[in-house]
Amino acid sequence: MKKFTTFILTLIIGVCQAQNRDPEAQTLLNEMSAKVNEYKNMVLEFKYTLDNSEENIHQETRGNITLVGDNYVLNILGITRIFDGKKLITISPEDEEVTISKQNTTEENTITPSQLLTFYEEGYNYKMDIIQNVRGRKIQYIKLNPIDSNSEISYVLLGIDTNTKHVHNLIEIGSNGTKTTLTITAFKTNQPLSESLFTFDASKYGDYYINNLD
């Protein structure tokens, strides 16, 4: 789940730095990051797919995420994850369990949205790739290749709407042939949000097991 959350946040916030910089790609990435930073909040819906033809695997699911600064509420696979800036609350209705833990920003695959602005600072080379027309929208792809030759990732394609400067999708191709795609299906900004959105109310989960790891 940590890796999945990282993947989603990477798509939303995007990639802005790398070692081998294509100036044209760098300009587009900077514009995308600047646009994201303009918003007070973002409320997004997305589709997540995982495919591996050799293993005959196809998985598809949908979810949504609300972001305010580093705080977020993520709903995916029936699980809700709430990060309030200090603690990470994971709510699993299927298990009737709530897990509360501190967000350890030094732990691998545990990052916050603001940190994603430099997440790939030393990990990738990148360049402009193809342009696609998606229902009248011009989507420019940037191809990122990992510097580490032993990486489990073969390459990443980041699709950016050239008009809105919003991320359209992120496609990750694994070294084992697995293709993971995250596509934004709805993108709303500066929405009226409840002040208690990131507050966990234990009284609503009286029958749940509360696992406090602090």
Question: Residue spans of the language-model regions?
Answer:
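Gly/Pro-enriched, hydrophobic low-complexity segments
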Residues: Y124-G206, I210-L213
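Bacterial Sec-dependent N-terminal signal peptides
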Residues: M1-R21, A25
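N-terminal leader/targeting segments and the immediate start of mature chains
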Residues: C16-N56, D70, K204, Y209-D214
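Beta-turn initiation residues at beta-strand->coil junctions
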Residues: Y48, S92-P93, I171-G174
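Short, exposed beta-strand/loop patches in secreted or surface proteins that constitute
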Residues: K35, G63-T66, T80-R81, K127-N133
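Flexible, surface-exposed loop/linker segments and immediately adjacent secondary-structure boundaries
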Residues: Q103-R137
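An acidic-aromatic
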Residues: R62-I111, T180-T181
